[in-house]
Every structure is written in structure tokens, then in C-alpha cells.
């Protein structure tokens, strides 16, 4: 009897210890949840010290929980912020790449034009002296128009260059025939013979082709970098739908409510949620990849025949060669013009000598050897810039289709693939068994985690798709050497974010309904139920065994 009484006492003590241990485990579990909750800046009074009944929860599992209703609501907002932050970080990195490369190209092209103008001015001052200074505005106007084309694009390069050569011919014709008086009407007649007489040789034709192709390619490429920068900037501002926010809450913080604060979401579970939340962004991928391919095509032109550096660097020598050609053939050119436009009126004798003295154009062209000729702009070369950008463009391909995976690869968002059995699947700590859905809006009809309205594409995304499509077309024109007109998307969609999907209908409340289980009693839920049962049973297992032992002892007697 004494022995039996001792056993009963021991079992009673064991049962009491087990109960205390269970309370202590609960306290520890919720205290850690509370600590992390407070660390995010939330009120500790929202968080219970012990597990409570979860009937008040609208999204997270309604078992015993460490989350109050206030916690679930604040976790919902926090999960949305976490998602926006991670997506923004990934997009901002890409946006910064395009922004910095656009800035480098822009600085390079502008400095290249400045260097070319300075080089021409220095060369012509030393070669032609006062004669050039008297006519320098003609060359200044040339560079003003070239700069205006690069900055604004509203210049017809062919017409502008034709006008430059016509004006230069008028000036040259006066200089080589300084003994005559020419009216404006006569000089207008002279300009009509430019194509027929070719007073400047083949330089105007070649230079017009080279300048047009090089400037079109350079400006289009720079504008392409700017468009890529702006598209990424606009799309990076995501506004999750209510359904997406529910899924994010369930993925990121509902595990905390179960006390599983160190367990991260399963990778495939995260992938399905991100593909649902970023469905519209996935639809950018096709036009984005076409745009990247077109940019790479133009980059090849910049490295080869349309290299603006190789065109602008020797432009002073080419124009001077044209002037020399006119000087060498001035007699033949003048005779043919006199035949076509009629003999000009000679100047009075006194004015003839003064005019010849002022022109002083009888001297031959003197070779110019500058002490230091600028060969690069902005401290680099076009080849180096293009090589760098080509590498970045190749890396940017398929950015939007890979964005969900990139987000889930962030250790803040999901566990690695190697932890498939030790991760949060939305209901418990177990393997995630659903297949990963495809990218894009059309593939989200069967997404097991996020309800997506596949009939309402995001307007902002559609605008960016159109911007990419138009820019791709202009890239192809530039690749073929054709001039292009540019459009302005800077004012479109300002301040908008993608993904809201609420433009056509009123957005539902954040906590309008409990998250729908699309699969009924899934394998995930069964695994979680089993896991939850194990967690609840452990504290009372010892007490149950003791009672069973006492009953058996009674039978033995």
C-alpha cells in the first residue's frame, strides 16, 4: 500500500509539473512573438503573454494563437510594406543602373560635341585666321543645331546639313570672287548649283550620311536608356490588392501567431504568392525582352559604322578638306556658275583691291598639328561605354519574369529550397505540396494562394508595355539608319503604382473574409493538424501515462 501511495504521489507531482511546463512553454512561445512584435514598433499591449483562442482571426489559422485581432491587422499592413520594400529594392537596383548609364552617355555625347566644336574653332583660327573669325557664326550655328538635335530631336539633320553647305558655298563663292558684287538673288542662284557642281567634292554627301546615322543611333540609344529607367521606376511602385495582402500576411506573419517565429515560408509557397501578386509585372517580360534585344542591336551600330565618336572627332578636318576642294576648283566652279546665273557685276577698282586685301584667301591650306587633340569625352570612350551597357542589358533580360523568384531568394522572404520540410506552408511547419504556377496574368487562374482577377490587367503596366513597344520600333529604325521621332512618357502615370487592380471596382476591405482554402482538406492542412496535435499533446503525455500505470497496478492486485 505504501508503495502504491508513493507511486500515486509521484504521478500527481509529474502531472502538475507537466501542466506547469506546458504553461511555461506557452509563455515562452508568446513572449518571443511579443518581443518581435514590439521590436517592429508596435504596442506591446496588443500582444498576449499566453496563447489565446483564435476565433477572432480573419486571415491566420483560427487555432490557439499568440496574435490578437490588433496584431493581425498591424501584421497585415506590415506584410504589405515588407513586400513593397523588397520589390522596390530589386527594381531600384535595375533603375539605378539605367539611370547611371544614361547619365554617362548623356555627358559623353554633350562633351563630345563641345570638344569637336572647340577643336574646329582652334584649327580654323590657326589655319584661316581673321577670315574664319568673320564667318565663325556659320560654324557655331552648325554645332548649335547638332546639340539641339541631340537634346530635343526637333531638327531635320539632312535639311540642316544641306543648309550649312549652301551657306558655306555662298561665303566661299564671295571670297574666291571678291572682285565681283553679288546680290542675294544671285547667291540664291549659286546655291542651286551645289548638287550639280559638287564644289566641296564628296565630303558633304559622306558627312551627311555619317552624321545622320551616328546622331540618330546615339540619341536613340540614350533615349532608350532613359525609357528603361522610367519604366522600371514606375513599375517598381507596387500596390498589392486586398487578396494579395491577405496572402502576404498569411505567408510572412501568420507563422508568428503559431509561435513559429524562426520558421520561414517555403520557397514554392512564396513563389506562388509572388507570381500572383506580381502577375501584371510578369506581362511586361515579352516587350521588355524585345526592347533589350533592340537596344543591343543599336549598341552594335554604335560600336561599328554609326560610331558618333569616329564621326565627330575628325569633323574639323573633313570640313577643311571640303574648303580646300572648293579652293582648288574655284575657277571651274565660278565659270559654270557664271554660265548658269549670268555674269556678275564687277566692283569699282578701289573696292576690288580693298576686298581682295580683306579676304586674303589666296593662301593655301596650311596643315594643322594640334599640340593635344581631345580623343575622348567625359574621361572615357564610346567603345568602353557601349561594352559596359551591353553587359548590363544582357543581365536585365527576363527581369520581370524572374522577379518573383528573385524576391523569394531574399532570405527575409522565404527559406531556401534545401529546407523543403522545415518551412512554413501557410498552415504549419511542413512541406509545401502545391505546384508553382506560371508567370503573367493569364496563368493565375489556378493559383492556389492568391485570387487574381485575370480579366482586368493593370493600366499602368499596359502603358509601359506600349512605351516599350514604341521605343523598340524606334530602335529598329535607328539600327537601319533612319531618323526617328520621339514621344514623351514623362507625364504618364505619374505617382501611380502597379498592382492595385482597383481602378474598375471598389477595393474590398482588408479583413472582409477569412482566407479561402482552395483545396479543401489539403495535404498541407492535414500535415499541419498533425503537427499542431503533437505540440498540444506533449505537456500532458506524462500525466496520461501515470494514470494508465495506476489503472494497470489496480488490475495486477
Curated annotation (Swiss-Prot):
Residues 1-18 form the signal peptide. A lipid is attached at residue 529 (GPI-anchor amidated serine). GO terms for cellular component: collagen-containing extracellular matrix; external side of plasma membrane; extracellular space; glutamatergic synapse; Golgi lumen; presynaptic membrane; synapse. It is a lipid-anchor; GPI-anchor. Residues 530-557 form a propeptide. The modification Phosphoserine is found at residue 357. It is found in: Cell membrane. Glycans are attached at residues 494, 498, 500, 514. Disruption phenotype: Knockout mice have short fore and hind paws, and display a significant decrease in the length of the snout. The keyword Cell membrane applies. InterPro entries: Glypican, Glypican_CS. Keywords: Cell membrane, Glycoprotein, GPI-anchor, Heparan sulfate, Lipoprotein, Membrane, Phosphoprotein, Proteoglycan, Secreted, Signal. Highly expressed in developing brain and kidney. GO terms for biological process: regulation of neurotransmitter receptor localization to postsynaptic specialization membrane; regulation of presynapse assembly; regulation of signal transduction; synaptic membrane adhesion; Wnt signaling pathway. Belongs to the glypican family. Cell surface proteoglycan that bears heparan sulfate. May be involved in the development of kidney tubules and of the central nervous system. This is Glypican-4. It comes from Mus musculus. The lineage of its organism: Eukaryota, Metazoa, Chordata, Craniata, Vertebrata. The gene is Gpc4.
Amino acid at each position: 500500500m505504501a508503495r502504491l501511495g508513493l507511486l500515486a504521489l509521484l504521478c500527481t507531482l509529474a502531472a502538475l509539473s507537466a501542466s506547469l511546463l506546458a504553461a511555461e512553454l506557452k509563455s515562452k512561445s508568446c513572449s518571443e512573438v511579443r518581443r518581435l512584435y514590439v521590436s517592429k514598433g508596435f504596442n506591446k499591449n496588443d500582444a498576449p503573454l499566453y496563447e489565446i483562442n483564435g476565433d477572432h482571426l480573419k486571415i491566420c489559422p483560427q487555432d490557439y494563437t499568440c496574435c490578437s485581432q490588433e496584431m493581425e491587422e498591424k501584421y497585415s499592413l506590415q506584410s504589405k510594406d515588407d513586400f513593397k520594400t523588397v520589390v522596390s529594392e530589386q527594381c531600384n537596383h535595375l533603375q539605378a543602373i539605367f539611370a547611371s548609364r544614361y547619365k554617362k552617355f548623356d555627358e559623353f555625347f554633350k562633351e563630345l560635341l563641345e570638344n569637336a566644336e572647340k577643336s574646329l574653332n582652334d584649327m580654323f583660327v590657326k589655319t584661316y585666321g581673321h577670315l574664319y573669325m568673320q564667318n565663325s557664326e556659320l560654324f557655331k550655328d552648325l554645332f548649335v543645331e547638332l546639340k539641339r538635335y541631340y537634346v530635343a530631336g526637333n531638327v531635320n539633320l539632312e535639311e540642316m546639313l544641306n543648309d550649312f553647305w549652301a551657306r558655306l558655298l555662298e561665303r566661299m563663292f564671295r571670297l574666291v570672287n571678291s572682285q565681283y558684287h553679288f546680290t542675294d538673288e544671285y547667291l540664291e542662284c549659286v546655291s542651286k548649283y551645289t548638287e550639280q557642281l559638287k564644289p566641296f567634292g564628296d565630303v558633304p554627301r559622306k558627312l551627311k550620311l555619317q552624321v545622320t546615322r551616328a546622331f540618330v543611333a546615339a540619341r536613340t540609344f540614350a533615349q532608350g536608356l532613359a525609357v528603361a529607367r522610367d519604366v522600371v521606376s514606375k513599375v517598381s511602385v507596387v500596390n498589392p490588392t486586398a487578396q494579395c495582402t491577405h496572402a502576404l500576411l498569411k505567408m510572412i506573419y501568420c507563422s508568428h501567431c503559431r509561435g513559429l517565429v524562426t520558421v520561414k515560408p517555403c520557397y514554392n509557397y512564396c513563389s506562388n504568392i509572388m507570381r500572383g501578386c506580381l502577375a501584371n509585372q510578369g506581362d511586361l517580360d515579352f516587350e521588355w525582352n524585345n526592347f533589350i534585344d533592340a537596344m543591343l542591336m543599336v549598341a552594335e551600330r554604335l560600336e561599328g559604322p554609326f560610331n558618333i565618336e569616329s564621326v565627330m572627332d575628325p569633323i574639323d578636318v573633313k570640313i577643311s578638306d571640303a574648303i580646300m576642294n572648293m579652293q582648288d576648283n574655284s575657277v571651274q566652279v565660278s565659270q559654270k556658275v557664271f554660265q548658269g546665273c549670268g555674269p556678275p557685276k564687277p566692283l569699282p577698282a578701289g573696292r576690288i583691291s580693298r576686298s581682295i586685301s580683306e579676304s586674303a584667301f589666296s593662301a593655301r591650306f596650311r596643315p594643322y598639328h594640334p599640340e593635344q587633340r581631345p580623343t575622348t569625352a567625359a574621361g572615357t570612350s564610346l567603345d568602353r561605354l557601349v561594352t559596359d551597357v551591353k553587359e548590363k542589358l544582357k543581365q536585365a533580360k527576363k527581369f520581370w519574369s524572374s522577379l518573383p523568384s528573385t524576391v523569394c531568394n531574399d532570405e527575409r522572404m522565404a527559406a531556401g529550397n534545401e529546407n523543403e520540410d522545415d518551412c512554413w506552408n501557410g498552415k504549419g511547419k511542413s512541406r509545401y505540396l502545391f505546384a508553382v504556377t506560371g508567370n503573367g496574368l493569364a496563368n493565375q487562374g489556378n493559383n492556389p494562394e492568391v485570387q487574381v482577377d485575370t480579366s482586368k490587367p493593370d493600366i499602368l503596366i499596359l502603358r509601359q508595355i506600349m512605351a516599350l513597344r514604341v521605343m523598340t520600333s524606334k530602335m529598329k529604325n535607328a539600327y537601319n539608319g533612319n531618323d526617328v521621332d520621339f514621344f514623351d512618357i514623362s507625364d504618364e502615370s505619374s505617382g501611380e503604382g502597379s498592382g492595385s487592380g482597383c481602378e474598375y471596382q471598389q477595393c474590398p476591405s482588408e479583413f472582409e473574409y477569412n482566407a479561402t482554402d482552395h483545396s479543401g482538406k489539403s495535404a498541407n492542412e492535414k500535415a499541419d493538424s498533425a503537427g499542431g496535435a503533437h505540440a498540444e499533446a506533449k505537456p500532458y503525455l506524462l500525466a496520461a501515462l501515470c494514470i494508465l500505470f495506476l489503472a494497470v497496478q489496480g488490475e495486477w492486485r
